[in-house]
C-alpha cells in the first residue's frame, strides 16, 4: 500500500541517438496501472509435490528456443525476463548507437560485451539459478534490466495488468515468491 513513485524523465542528452529515438524516455522501476504492478518476477522457490518428491529433485528439459533481450529506444525490452538455467538469451541492438551489455550476477560469471549498432545478435547463457541477475549498459547508465534464472519452468513476469500464470505446475504445496526491483519479495 501507499503512494506509487512517479516515473521520472531520463536525461539522455549524453547520446544524441538516444535522445532522437526516445525523446521522452521514462524510468520503468514502478510500472503501475490502476493499482496493478507490472514487471514483478514470480516463481516457485520450493515445494513438495503430491507424491512427496521435492521440486528441486526433478529434472526439467532446458528450452532450446532463446529468450530475447532487445536494446530498443535506449532501454532494455523486456525490463524483466525469465529463463531456465542454460536457456539461450539472444541480445539484439535495435538502436542507432553502440550499447554495452553487462550482466552482473552473484552466482554466475560476469559477462560484459560491447554491441555496436548494426552488429549481429549475441547469445548468452546463465549456468546457475539466480533471482535476479541485474543487466546494465555501461555507456548508458539509465539502462537496466533483470533476468530471473531457475532450474524449472515455473516462473512468470507480471503483465501491465499485474496478472501472471504459472503453467503446468503439478499438484503439491509450494512457496511462490514475487520479486520486484523496488523492494520486498
Please state what every model-predicted region is:
Residues 2-185:
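Extracytoplasmic copper-binding redox domains, predominantly the cupredoxin/blue-copper superfamily
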